[in-house]
Amino acid sequence: MTESATSLREQKRWETSHRISMCAQRLTDVHGLDGFTMDDLADAAEVSRRTLFNYFPSKLDAVLGTIPELPPAAKAAFHDGGPHGSLIEDLGALAKALLAVKEPDRETMMLTRRVLVGSDRVLAAAHQRFEQLTDDFAALILEREGDDFPVEHARLAVRIIGALFDSALSTFLEGGDRPLDELFDLYLNQARSLFT
């Protein structure tokens, strides 16, 4: 199979996954997590039950959606000590590369945040997913920095990036015309000035 055919198939898979997730979030926003069935979700997303279950095993998984894969070039650059040569800045670049795979719009991010704060179960599941993502990113740091780098430092670095992203996201959701990645850079620079 050609690379373009593979990327087209991956693009279609991502679009279907995203559509299902957005429908799950809208249904959760309106009816609560227990207020709709997987059949309702399949109908709303215009997919068969079989397709729905091929993408997500549960409503909760559908609401949380799929975490996009890191672009291989960004992952390789990070592993090799780049793109900036500073762990925190390089982690920031990695996080922005992950976000850029399918950068959501303000309305989508507002819906996601409403759903998260509106349901303790969704929030707890999102926290578990963040912990897994923290472990994954910490593993990338340890691969890059070597065995002598403390795992606690790797996890702390990821959590710092998460806090900066959350601050940027809050500002982004308040409105204005600055894109999320610019706001992230702004908060990264502010954090750097606090620590120097």
PLM regions and their residue ranges:
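C-terminal peripheral helix-coil segments that are non-catalytic and often amphipathic
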Residues: E3, E174-T196
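Short hydrophobic/aromatic patch on the recognition helix
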Residues: V47-F56
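Short amphipathic alpha-helical segment with a characteristic S/N-K-E followed by hydrophobic residues
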Residues: S58-V63, A73
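Amphipathic alpha-helical packing segments from all-alpha helical-bundle domains
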Residues: D120-E145, E152-R159, S167
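Hydrophobic alpha-helical segments that form the core
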Residues: L116, A124, V151-S170, L183-A191
